[in-house]
Amino acid sequence: MKQILFMDTTLRDGEQSPGVNLNEQEKLQIARQLERLGIHVMEAGFAAASEGDFQSVKRIANTIQNATVMSLARAKESDIRRAYEAVKGAVSPRLHVFLATSDIHMKYKLCMSKEDVLDSIYRSVTLGKSLFPTVQFSAEDATRTARDFLAEAVEVAIRAGANVINIPDTVGYTNPEEYYALFKYLQESVPSYEKAIFSCHCHDDLGMAVANSLAAVEGGALQVEGTINGIGERAGNAALEEVAVALHIRKDFYKAEPSMTLKEIKATSTLVSRLTGMVVPKNKAIVGANAFAHESGIHQDGVLKEVTTYEIIEPALVGESQNLFVLGKHSGRHAFTEKMKELGYEFTNDERDAVFEAFKKLADRKKEITEEDLRALMLGEAAFAAQQYNITQLQVHFVSNSTQCATVVLKDEEGNVFEDAATGSGSIEAIYNAIQRILGLECELADYRIQSITQGQDALAHVHVELKEGAHQVSGFGVAQDVLEASARAYVHAAGKLKSFIQLVK
């Protein structure tokens, strides 16, 4: 049975989702979780896009030990050399070079002839191969490219040294029958077909990204590209968790097995959702809150008698926790550390002490600590540690029926303390006005969302905010048992990002 490899582009294509803005620390968190998920290749970013992207890609490349780290690059020497500088320290570095091959892209975007495109493919892949052990070439807009020219372009790339050939459905245009046929056509029409691994990359504009990816596997693709939760440009990408579980459950049909640690799916989905602020729909396959819920009386009766009557996926397969109570206020440092290791977290002694202290504070207020609480705790403490400013004091006073006053004290990385107060029509508005006064910002609150992480009156709150000032928009999140504290943390997280970004642009 053939093994299907997964190339995750959450950190590159996924981050292009409108409103998503991840900092370096957040990208590293996701990269480490993707490593635990067993992703074969992770596209860490587009190193030539900006200095920030370059540094993020470089840090991920120097950190990840058990996956290939790849950078995107245009078919330009400067891009390719910049990508090399970013990922050369990786255990397994890879270049991902792309060039459009469809008539519409060649005519209107590239202003290049077919001969020029073929020459550029050959030169860029050849250069890449002189620097990288593995080169992937993508024929952008492949599904709207003339088949004979696509086959010619692919052959040129393989002869130049490309190890992986990606056939992307860049605008989500194709359907499963067409995509399957395209892979079969290339298998028959590319003389050097056997010298490369073929990959698929599907967008969801017509809602067929997962179906098209599975059709590509039927057609001979050995690598599937996509993102966690299907996030990405426009309508998003193929959701890798859906493709992987479909291959596993229906291996009788696809004759293929996903190369992925399926039990890490839920944790990965949750992390990506909380860091990006993109809420997973309740009815989403595999990772939605209702994925394993049964409300119909007939269905409930059937499941109670025999679970397979209405449930084809065991929740534990994808890491859906059935074990609620894990730790409490009497748990010691050793038990806490071992439990965190079990969940896949490793940290230095200083990091452990900080997180354990946060755990003890939470345990004093919360009767039961669940795995979701622990993951949220790690998420919140990581964001807290990465912030330029941290909240040391927060007070809200009732002034009148329509006005409240908030006093906020912040401390920066150098230990400088800033304090101010402001009023607002509610507690949160007053807090946000005070923070704006301290940081000297005049930004607009573009989005505010609150989500309960666990059940019960003592549940942790996760707040996501998006701030906008002029053309700049950033997001931030905060986790705390108190909604006002979580809201303040989220605002400080985002405001610190916005202030840094504005200073960088200036």
From Swiss-Prot:
It is found in: Cytoplasm. One of its GO terms (molecular function) is manganese ion binding. Its main location: cytoplasm. The keyword Acyltransferase does not apply. Residues 4-266 form the Pyruvate carboxyltransferase domain. Its cofactor is Mn(2+). GO terms for biological process: L-leucine biosynthetic process. Pathway: Amino-acid biosynthesis; L-leucine biosynthesis; L-leucine from 3-methyl-2-oxobutanoate: step 1/4. InterPro entries: 2-IPM_HCS-like (IPR050073), 2-isopropylmalate_synth_dimer (IPR013709), AIPM/Hcit_synth_CS (IPR002034), Aldolase_TIM (IPR013785), LeuA/HCS_post-cat (IPR054691), LeuA_allosteric_dom_sf (IPR036230), LeuA_bact_synth (IPR005671), PYR_CT (IPR000891). Catalyzes the condensation of the acetyl group of acetyl-CoA with 3-methyl-2-oxobutanoate (2-ketoisovalerate) to form 3-carboxy-3-hydroxy-4-methylpentanoate (2-isopropylmalate). Belongs to the alpha-IPM synthase/homocitrate synthase family. LeuA type 1 subfamily. This is 2-isopropylmalate synthase. It comes from Bacillus cereus (strain AH820).
